[in-house]
């Protein structure tokens, strides 16, 4: 956690140039595709992104807890996004890395956005069992906050649903909550809730 905190402080103390943005967040639980990455505990997260036209690249990190010696996740990604009227298409690659003895994972993805809906597909060329599909719907008729519903499926027997409600407090701070329900062939887990506060700069 000290490594991530040092990086986050470096981001906030460094003036960002055109095309570069950053974020920090504190969350009561870190969900990834329906599963907690912190065994129900809080996480400190942060990242930095560079955008130039349709090209982008970035890095993102979070504290994690799997009950092993792995305590930090750090991801790198790059891609290209193009917008055609109401349709936007994003293709890229992302690598998930971990300290300790946990192996890194590399995925290719394509995400299509149309109006208030998006559909995405992520695949690992080394492990087809972990291929992941996701559909997300933002609810434009709700005006008091940003509300979205997400359904994801991965592997052969697991899916989850997530409802996220967020509210911008000002130009930099956003607070929100996420409610997640995960299902598999053998187990239906209870709903879990995470609260978060993020800062964008």
Model-derived segments and spans:
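Outer-membrane beta-barrel proteins
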Residues: 4-6, 15-201
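Repetitive helical segments and hydrophobic/amphipathic motifs
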Residues: 11-12
């Amino acid at each position: 956690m000290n490594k991530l905190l040092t990086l986050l402080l470096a981001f906030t103390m460094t003036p960002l140039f055109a095309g570069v943005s950053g974020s920090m967040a504190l969350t009561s639980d870190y969900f990834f595709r329906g599963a907690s990455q912190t065994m129900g505990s809080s996480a400190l997260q942060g990242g930095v992104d560079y955008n130039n036209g349709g090209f982008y690249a970035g890095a993102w990190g979070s504290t994690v807890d799997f009950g092993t010696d792995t305590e930090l996740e750090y991801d790198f990604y790059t891609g290209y996004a193009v917008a055609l009227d109401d349709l936007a298409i994003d293709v890229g690659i992302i690598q998930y890395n971990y300290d300790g003895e946990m192996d890194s994972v590399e995925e290719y993805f394509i995400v299509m956005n149309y109006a208030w809906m998006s559909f995405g597909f992520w695949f690992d060329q080394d492990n087809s069992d972990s291929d992941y599909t996701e559909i997300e719907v933002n609810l434009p008729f709700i005006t008091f906050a940003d509300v979205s519903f997400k359904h994801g499926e991965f592997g052969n027997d697991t899916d989850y649903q997530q409802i996220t409600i967020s509210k911008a407090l000002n130009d930099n701070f956003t607070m929100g909550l996420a409610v997640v329900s995960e299902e598999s062939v053998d187990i239906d887990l209870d709903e879990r809730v995470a609260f978060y506060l993020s800062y964008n700069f």
